[in-house]
A protein has these predicted regions:
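Sec-dependent signal peptide recognition
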Residues: 2-9
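N-terminal signal peptide c-region/cleavage motif recognized by signal peptidases
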Residues: 14-16
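Short glycine/threonine-rich turn/loop motifs
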Residues: 20-127, 191-294, 300-302, 327-345
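Mobile amphipathic helical/loop "lid" adjacent to a hydrophobic cofactor/ligand pocket
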Residues: 121, 135-136
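C-terminal capping alpha-helices of c-type cytochrome domains
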Residues: 139-186, 274, 284-345
Length: 345
């Protein structure tokens, strides 16, 4: 009898190991771990000098017309690369139309912004600084501000030694792109799991991973960034209410002017998703549990049980990686030539 009990235990343990191996194999076919090395950026080699300059620019509010809004205002590196409100507040207390996307791991996205209107981080960096509802500056104002401070001029010369002049709006964007390329978050429990550590996820997280794949979540949220690669309508099966999907915001339609792109958005990357509530482009959902329930119904037509929802949320918590250590930079001192703040619209 004792031998039979031991045999049963061994069979169960063996079955559990096989199930774990099958799950890991299936996951590796869909997802990739974030590399520990800084990724290469097309047509913009990332150097220490360029990334350091980009960090200064990222944190400098004087590049906005008001002198009080920086990139970090809306993409706060201390709060998951996003701000705390449903949508960002910009120049003259104007409210943005959409939730600020996270800057962490954005280098791995196929395109930038919810509607994918920027093909890369360089193009993205040029957008908010000029947007009237965000930083409300102009390329001339940006370069005039930078040229007015010798500390910046010297940094641009170091970062772009072959360019004359070194301070240009294009180089401003390249430096920010280089810095943002360093904002990756490797070594999440899920990364460790994909790299072969079966114990990196607990049983509930593994159950959530299996559900995430079996229910169809991974059809959109796949790859290295677990999203950020494709475009889909918000409301494939059932259209959300107007609180979640405001009728005035037609998503990618504004970029392509194609009726097939109405209410189509870039799939949100899910890395560090537990760190950056509220959720969706409208920023109206404050818990992962509610977000998972909504997505399962409107995108997949599935009604999750309480346990299924909790298991998927547990898996999503395993996507939080190691945040880079960021020291707040000391910025160059303004001079009498530095343009004064302008609060007018």
């Amino acid at each position: 009898m004792r031998k039979m009990s031991i045999a049963i235990v061994l069979v169960l343990v063996s079955s559990h190991a096989i199930a774990n191996d099958d799950l890991m194999t299936a996951a590796r076919q869909v997802f990739k771990p974030i590399p520990s090395a800084i990724p290469a950026v097309k047509d913009n080699p990332v150097t220490v000098e360029k990334a350091e300059l980009g960090k200064m620019l990222f944190f400098d509010p004087r590049l906005s017309a008001s002198g009080i809004i920086s990139c970090n205002t809306c993409h706060n590196l201390g709060t998951g690369g996003v701000d705390a409100g449903p949508t960002s507040v910009g120049h003259g207390w104007q409210k943005g139309a959409r939730r600020a996307p996270t800057v962490y791991n954005s280098v791995f996205n196929a395109a930038q912004f919810w509607d994918g209107r920027a093909p890369d981080l360089k193009a993205q960096a040029k957008g908010p600084v000029q947007a009237s509802a965000e930083m409300n500056a102009t390329p001339d104002r940006v370069t005039s501000t930078l040229n007015s401070m010798e500390g910046y001029v010297g940094k641009f010369k170091q970062a772009f030694p072959n360019d004359t002049p070194p301070v240009t709006f294009d180089n401003f964007a390249k430096a920010i792109e280089a810095f943002e390329a360093t904002l990756t978050t490797p070594a999440a429990p899920f990364d460790q799991y994909l790299n072969g550590d079966v114990s990196a996820l607990d049983d509930q997280q593994k159950a959530g991973l299996k559900l995430f794949m079996d229910k169809g979540c991974a059809s959109c949220h796949y790859g290295l960034n677990i999203g950020g690669q494709d475009y889909f309508p918000f409301g494939v099966v059932e259209k959300p209410d107007t609180k979640l999907l405001p009728t005035a915001d037609k998503g990618r339609f504004a970029v392509t002017n194609s009726s097939s792109d109405e209410y189509v958005f870039r799939v949100a990357p899910l890395r560090n998703v537990a760190l950056r509530a509220p959720y969706f482009h409208s920023g109206q959902v404050w818990t992962l549990k509610e977000a998972v329930g909504i997505m399962s119904e409107v995108q997949l037509g599935a009604k999750l049980s309480e346990k299924e929802n909790n298991d998927i949320v547990a898996f999503l918590n395993s996507l939080s990686g190691r945040l880079p250590k960021i020291d707040y930079p000391i910025l160059p001192t303004r001079t009498k030539e530095t343009p004064p703040p302008s609060l007018s619209k």
